[in-house]
Amino acid sequence: MTENRRIKRVNALLQEAIAKVILKDVKHPKISNLWITVTRVSLSKDLHSARVYVSVMPHENTKEEALEALKVSAGFIAHRASKNVVLKYFPELHFYLDDIFSPQDYIENLLWQIQEKEKS
């Protein structure tokens, strides 16, 4: 029970630290104009790897590119986040798209397309 509580607490700390690094420190051109939200972090029981689930806005066709950019930047993100979350071994980060906002994404994408059509 205590271990489970510890993992939940570390998940929350990692989520906050990773989100701050992505927002402030990552300067990758494919994600600089996107709104990336870290929706959850799932740490392995041995604390050596973490699944980081992200949601990417504003539109559908940038999600895969943003995910690839995050995967390329994973080492940098882990290094920067490790300064805020002190662990004996900082976990290896693995990024995944989270479909938690998929209905909202669909509506957002439709609104984006309407806006683009009105501009042209």
From Swiss-Prot:
It is found in: Cytoplasm. Pfam families: RBFA (PF02033). It comes from the Bacteria. InterPro entries: KH_dom-like_a/b (IPR015946), RbfA (IPR000238), RbfA_dom_sf (IPR023799), Ribosome-bd_factorA_CS (IPR020053). One of its GO terms (biological process) is maturation of SSU-rRNA. GO terms for molecular function: ribosomal small subunit binding. Belongs to the RbfA family. Monomer. Binds 30S ribosomal subunits, but not 50S ribosomal subunits or 70S ribosomes. This is Ribosome-binding factor A. It comes from Chlamydia pneumoniae.
